[in-house]
Each structure stands twice: as structure tokens, then as C-alpha cells.
């Protein structure tokens, strides 16, 4: 049972993702760390972003303590998920709860439920972080100048560096790490994922995988890394949009090499002078006047983090980021190719995989096999 009118910022709940909100609301009143303002049944909406865990907005009516009402966010695995290791709600909840004292930009946790009888799976609930989230373009009504956009960009990079500076031992998060060898594990793991998910219509990527395997640097440090650090996971202050008030989506966070995190983040970083295919793949406003280029991001991050990273050294992290993104896209394309999803948004993911392999080869100066990806991906 769900509400007919969804809360602001969320759409209607899809039928296959619906749940008994009265049962969840009752459980929350009994188990929330702070149950103030949780009387009654909230209206419910579903956020449409992301391709993994499901995210809902619960909006409670106004009360004396919360005159504007109270908004909570509920996170759960996809319906029907059996492999809990891939959608570990307990891990995601506990990581943010432990991190909050050292990195206050994480949302405040409200409750974790492991009783699958309540909703059909385990889930957790957190306070909603109020603010703006940038998508493909900066809304013109924000009136951000190039100078203001640059300040926002620098603040985002500094936020990532601040996260990497958290003392994981003091925060009680060291158990997330598996010790030295993070780079090697990532190269081997993502290569295996690509081979398992490959379909006949995409490159074999063996040349890029072989290069990564043969040019692995030693770990450059051990830090808490986000692993999905993008503008659409950052919440901005509406009154001061150059200020970040929240960092969302900690599903992939772990302890590992901070430069691998930066490389993964910059795979999504499309700048104004990129080729037409790369510009078509853009999902965040990193092309806007004032945004730093990828090279400037690396330079600023290295200065902030106290690291020395040469252009040649950075090449490994750049190619790894592009390859990792290709694997993520291919895992989705695999489902589309085999008819497991008919979402039209996934129709060009195979061409995107081919392009990312092409771009990786270009960075490495390797010969290009087969057809030019720009001919297979619509750039109009």
C-alpha cells in the first residue's frame, strides 16, 4: 500500500517496487533512534536515479516539532534480490553511522531493519539531506557564474580529499579493507567481471586488460573511498550552491587506494573540448564554464592530498577508470542484450562500451581494432 501523491523530488512508486507502508511506519515508530514527528502514515515516492538499490522518500505530516513535516529516505535492495553481499544494507547503514563523527556530510541514520517480514527484505532509513542535486546541466535559475562554478568544482575535489583523509582506524572502519594489494585485486576483479558479462557485439578488451595487469603501480595509500563520487551524489546548499551539505550513495564505499577512487570519478568527467561521443555520454555538468579540466582536477587533488602524481603515473588510473566504467556499462548491456530488461535507456550501452575501449586505447596509444565507435553510437 503506497500513497497516491508522491512527495517532492520523487515520482510514483513502481508497482513492482511497492511495499506495505503502514507496516513500515509502525515499525519505524517503535525502532527509530528518534521517533519524533513519525505519527501517522507518510506519503511515499520513489527516486528514479541509480541502477542498483531502491530509494524511497517518506514524507510525514507537520507536527509541533517539525512544522514543515519530516522527510526520511528508505533504502532497500532490488525486489527479488537473493545475493545479499551485492546489496548489503547493514554494511551501508553501519558505515555511514560510524563515519558521521569524522565526516559529517553523510546522512544521519535513523534505523536499520533486518526483519524481512516488515518489507520483504532488510532495509535502512535515514534523514533526508535537504538541498540541490545537479544532473546533466546546471539549472540556469541558479545563476552560477564561471567563478562560482569553479569554486563549486574545487569544493567537490576538496571534499573527496577530506574523505580520503579520514582516519579509518579511529572511525572503526578498518575492517572494510583487505590489506595491501588493492590495485591488483581491482584490476583482476573488474577484468573477470568484464569477461563474464561480455556479449558478441562488444570488443574483447583483452589488450586494455593486459596493459592494466602489466602496469599496476603499488598502492599509493589506504583510505576510505567512496567509489561513486559524482555531482549527482552531492547535495548542495540551495542558498549557497557552491557549498556541499551532503554526500549520498555509499553502497560501493570501502577502504582502498585513494587514487583509484579519483580515477573512477574522473571516468565520468566530460569536459567541454572532448570529442562528440564523450560529450554525448555526459551525465554531470563538468563541461560548464569554470569547471576544471581532468588534468586540473588531478593537479588540485594531488596538492590538497600531499601526493606527487606525474602525467605518466596518472595514465594507469585514467585507463582503469575508463575500463571500470566500461564494465559497469557492459553489465547493464548484458541484461539488455539477453532480454532481461527492455528499458530503452540501455539501448546504446553496448556502443558506449565500445567507445570506452576505444578511448582507453587512445590514451595508451594502442592500435584500434575494428569499426570506429563514433559510427556506432549516435552522436546527434
Where are these regions (language model features)?
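Juxta-kinase regulatory segment immediately upstream of eukaryotic protein kinase catalytic domains
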Residues: 2-37
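Activation of the activation-loop gatekeeper triad in protein kinase-fold domains
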Residues: 248-253
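ATP-binding pocket architecture of kinase catalytic cores
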Residues: 41-207, 211-224, 239-242
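Helical subdomain adjoining the active site within ATP-dependent kinase catalytic cores
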Residues: 307-311, 325-380
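Active-site activation/catalytic loop segments of kinase-like enzymes and analogous catalytic loops
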Residues: 260-306, 320-338
Amino acid at each position: 500500500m503506497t500513497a497516491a501523491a508522491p512527495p517532492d523530488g520523487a515520482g510514483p512508486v513502481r508497482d513492482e517496487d511497492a511495499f506495505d507502508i503502514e507496516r513500515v511506519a509502525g515499525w519505524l515508530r517503535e525502532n527509530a533512534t528518534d521517533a519524533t514527528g513519525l505519527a501517522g502514515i507518510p506519503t511515499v515516492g520513489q527516486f528514479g536515479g541509480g541502477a542498483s538499490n531502491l530509494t524511497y522518500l517518506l514524507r510525514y505530516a507537520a507536527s509541533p516539532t517539525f512544522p514543515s513535516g519530516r522527510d526520511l529516505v528508505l533504502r532497500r535492495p532490488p525486489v527479488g534480490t537473493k545475493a545479499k553481499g551485492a546489496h548489503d544494507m547493514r554494511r551501508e547503514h553501519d558505515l555511514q553511522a560510524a563515519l558521521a563523527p569524522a565526516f559529517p556530510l553523510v546522512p544521519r541514520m535513523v534505523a536499520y531493519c533486518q526483519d524481512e517480514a516488515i518489507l520483504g527484505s532488510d532495509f535502512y532509513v535515514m534523514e533526508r539531506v535537504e538541498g540541490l542535486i545537479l544532473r546533466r546541466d546546471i539549472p540556469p535559475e541558479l545563476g552560477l557564474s564561471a567563478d562560482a562554478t569553479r569554486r563549486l568544482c574545487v569544493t567537490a575535489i576538496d571534499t573527496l580529499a577530506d574523505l580520503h583523509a579520514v582516519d579509518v582506524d579511529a572511525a572503526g572502519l578498518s575492517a572494510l579493507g583487505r590489506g595491501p594489494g588493492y590495485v591488483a585485486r581491482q584490476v583482476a576483479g573488474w577484468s573477470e567481471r568484464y569477461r563474464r558479462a561480455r556479449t558478441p557485439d562488444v570488443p574483447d578488451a583483452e589488450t586494455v586488460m593486459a596493459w592494466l595487469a602489466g602496469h599496476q603501480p603499488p598502492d599509493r595509500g589506504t583510505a576510505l573511498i567512496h567509489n561513486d563520487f559524482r555531482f549527482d551524489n552531492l547535495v548542495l546548499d540551495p542558498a549557497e550552491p557552491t557549498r556541499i551539505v551532503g554526500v549520498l550513495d555509499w553502497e560501493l564505499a570501502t577502504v582502498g587506494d585513494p587514487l583509484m577512487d579519483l580515477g573512477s570519478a574522473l571516468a565520468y568527467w566530460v569536459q567541454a573540448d572532448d570529442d562528440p561521443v564523450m560529450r554525448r555520454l555526459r551525465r554531470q555538468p563538468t563541461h560548464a564554464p569554470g569547471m576544471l579540466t581532468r588534468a586540473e582536477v588531478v593537479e588540485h587533488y594531488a596538492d590538497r592530498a600531499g601526493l606527487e602524481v606525474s602525467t605518466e603515473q596518472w595514465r594507469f588510473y585514467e585507463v582503469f577508470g575508463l575500463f571500470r566504467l566500461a564494465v559497469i556499462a557492459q553489465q547493464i548491456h548484458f541484461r539488455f542484450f539477453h532480454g532481461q530488461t527492455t528499458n530503452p535507456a540501455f539501448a546504446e550501452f553496448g556502443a558506449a562500451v565500445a567507445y570506452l575501449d576505444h578511448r582507453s586505447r587512445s590514451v595508451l596509444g594502442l592500435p584500434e581494432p575494428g569499426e570506429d565507435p563514433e559510427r556506432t553510437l549516435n552522436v546527434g
